[in-house]
Amino acid sequence: MADILLLDNVDSFTYNLVDQLRASGHQVVIYRNQIGAEVIIERLQHMEQPVLMLSPGPGTPSEAGCMPELLQRLRGQLPIIGICLGHQAIVEAYGGQVGQAGEILHGKASAIAHDGEGMFAGMANPLPVARYHSLVGSNIPADLTVNARSGEMVMAVRDDRRRVCGFQFHPESILTTHGARLLEQTLAWALAK
């Protein structure tokens, strides 16, 4: 099972995610994004095979407390998984852009097309997922593989070398078909050597 530090970007979905992860047997500690990056880095150093998970949240990545600093300092040091705002922060940290989505969806199920690799191996394609966002990543740099889309909108990215990935959608939502399985496969991908 994974040892997860979940960065809480002050979102109502955070504890849905915590509950789903703990129900699968994972150890989860939660820190709010307002605390200093040093405190979180220190805690991660005392965890066995840590995974940093970046929660959904309001606003833009640059407004999300210590999250941008953590990404700059820890990318490539340990696996990082971002969801919604966390995904957008990953896109920005790699040099991509985040801006207004042409289509704003809050609490809607949407079918995404994916590449069937890594965390998406063996999953239905298209895959119904829950979307709650008005921002979207674009101009994705070459270090990130776009592994899922809804039309032209980027719905997931991954960096196989550094074990960093992000989902624009919410795998922890009841509207995401097989969300628990997707999270399990994502953690297995993140921890693969």
From Swiss-Prot:
Positions annotated as active site in the UniProt record: C84 (nucleophile), H170 (for gatase activity), E172 (for gatase activity)
Keyword Ion transport included in the entry's annotation: no
Glutamine amidotransferase type-1 domain span: 3-193
InterPro entries: Anth_synth/Amidotransfase, Class_I_gatase-like, GATASE, TrpG/PapA_dom
Binding site residues for L-glutamine: G57, P58, G59, Q88, S134, L135
CDD domains, alphabetized: GATase1_Anthranilate_Synthase
Catalytic reaction(s) noted: chorismate + L-glutamine = anthranilate + pyruvate + L-glutamate + H(+)
Keywords from the named record: Amino-acid biosynthesis, Aromatic amino acid biosynthesis, Glutamine amidotransferase, Lyase, Tryptophan biosynthesis
SUPFAM superfamilies: Class I glutamine amidotransferase-like (SSF52317)
One annotated GO molecular function: anthranilate phosphoribosyltransferase activity
PROSITE patterns given in the database record: GATASE_TYPE_1 (PS51273)
Pathway membership: Amino-acid biosynthesis; L-tryptophan biosynthesis; L-tryptophan from chorismate: step 1/5
A Pfam family reported for this protein in Swiss-Prot or TrEMBL: GATase
Chain's role: Part of a heterotetrameric complex that catalyzes the two-step biosynthesis of anthranilate, an intermediate in the biosynthesis of L-tryptophan. In the first step, the glutamine-binding beta subunit (TrpG) of anthranilate synthase (AS) provides the glutamine amidotransferase activity which generates ammonia as a substrate that, along with chorismate, is used in the second step, catalyzed by the large alpha subunit of AS (TrpE) to produce anthranilate. In the absence of TrpG, TrpE can synthesize anthranilate directly from chorismate and high concentrations of ammonia.
Assembly notes: Heterotetramer consisting of two non-identical subunits: a beta subunit (TrpG) and a large alpha subunit (TrpE).
NCBIfam families for the chain: trpG_papA (TIGR00566)
Protein name: Anthranilate synthase component 2
Organism lineage: Bacteria, Pseudomonadati, Pseudomonadota, Gammaproteobacteria, Enterobacterales
